[in-house]
């Protein structure tokens, strides 16, 4: 790595009961600094109820190729979605991280009108702009149509519209990543908003109604070319992690829980012979526990699941 070490880190501050606005905290990470490890600046949002989760930059290596048309884009703005509000904040970190401030607010109605999506989740800067995955479709409860990915302009931050042209069987969404030299994307599934906004729905989980598929896309054509079902009992296929070397055509996805035995698992996907393949390559067993010490959902299993949520 040739880049200089980061001097400031950014993290999110949440209000669990929505009584206060969420915020962005700037932390000094310079060794030897008198404020090392401390919050040195906070950007408090003007609204309550946003529920921050993931966030990302406006620019990165995926967006700086000369072929993208913005090879000199500056990594300057943080894009922070509100998962519950469907609002997006653009934070300017210049002229200095300790002076970070709100640059633009994209209100939910604009996202609804231009994309038909809601509940923005993951942010990745990429070859066509800023890619934002969503967990909800249209309508009040986010179930009027499938969720997906939309594109924002990486300089003006205008919402440009849906990314997908042909989604195939994809009807849920969670994470996504790509292999730019090979021109494909991989996406995963979690749930629709009624299945997570007020907590997990036990009946849906035990009935295997959460996401359990991986979708493979032609990145430039924006078309779903293959879908692989991991098996209905493998509930909540979440974080997608490709190989760091972009010429290698494999990656990983974590699955939260197997509803037959509560184990978590990690799966490897790869492309061979023009087709994608997926195989379970690691498992994490549930931890035995006394039934009377467990919530009702787990008492019949007599165990606590590891709940793989990130890899």
Show the residue positions of the predicted features.
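Short, conserved, GDST-rich strand-edge loop motifs in beta-rich repeat architectures
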Residues: 3-4, 11-18, 65-76, 80-81, ...
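Surface-exposed loop and turn segments in beta-propeller and other repeat-based domains
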Residues: 38-59, 103-116, 162-171, 224-238, ...
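Beta-propeller domains
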Residues: 2-73, 79-107, 141-144, 153-156
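Structural signature of eukaryotic scaffold interfaces centered on beta-propeller domains
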Residues: 1-5, 51-74, 116-127, 176-183, ...
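Asp-box/WD-like beta-propeller blade repeats and closely related beta-sheet repeat scaffolds
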Residues: 92-180
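Long, internal scaffold/assembly segments composed of regular secondary structure
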Residues: 186, 208-254
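Conserved small-residue
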Residues: 29, 33, 40, 140, ...
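Beta-propeller blade signature
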Residues: 22-29, 94, 145-157, 203-221, ...
